Amino acid sequence: MCMLTQENVINFLRHNPALTVSTLEKEAAIPKGTVAQTLAGTRNLSEKHLTALFPILSKYGYSDSLYEKARVISIINHKGGVGKTTTTSSLGEALARRGFKVLLVDLDPQGNLSQILGVDDPQSQVAQALLNHGTPLPVIEISENLFLSPSDIELADAEIQLILSVGGDLRLKNKLQPVLGQFDYVLIDCPPSLNKLTISAMNASNSCLITLLPEMSAVKGLNSLLQRVMEVKTNLNADLVVDGLVFTMVKKNTVHEGIKENVKSSVPFRVFNTEIKHLVDFQKSQILQSPIAKFSDNSEAAKNYRDFCDEFIQYLQVVK
């Protein structure tokens, strides 16, 4: 029996937008429009269709192990105010719109991510799951394909207990395991420091994404951040990789241009081409505690993150 499922076909094609559906149908010798209608949700693939598609998709890089579990990504920086939470919420929303099932984990005691998504006073939150063995990670549906594990200031007390507890670094990883099969992506919004919570997040992750404001005050701590990533990789999570760095709050001036070029020439990993510009809509959406796409879906700010999402998806397919 063919191991390929309709869900995996859809996931693979969403991760590979360059593949032409009509070409796949022709190579697999299945009726024209079969795959296109499946992507549109108007029909289902039969076992015969899946069997015919399997060798064709395999030729283009498909394997059964690609989408067994979610890819867990920590969004990190040692400094606050560099667009980390905005990137987490906006990237998650953009992925969800493309049909991927996304879980956002608020691991910042300030709870800004939860507040942006309209969860101001969570009754069940991440801290309770981390401190109590029998308590599962809370998962709240925010919108279609987008879910949240919320937090507030209670998480600060939890961090102190995690520092003192045996296996504290493993708590988040263990709590995520039961839900990984339900999602395509898990994005963790880390606190603006290199503390126990950030280490726990990286230990639970496949990779991390760095957000960086191109100003000296933000760039100065980049080496310390990368050193901490290497410490986690060496001592806790050998599979951890850096997906890359995305510049945020970018202004069109010579100072930002010079800093960006310096960073690009010095870091040993990808710097994404898409930059998140310094736009007033980002500030307005933060004041109103609203995701940028909900605040102004047609704005340049929302388009900025949709473009980054497209580039990020293309990158993920390459590394897989």
Over which residues does each language-model region extend?
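Alpha-helical residues within the helix-turn-helix
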Residues: K26
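P-loop NTP-binding core
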Residues: Q6-E7, F12-H15, S22, K32-G33, ...
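Short, Lys/Arg-enriched N-terminal segments with co-localized hydrophobic residues
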Residues: M1-C2
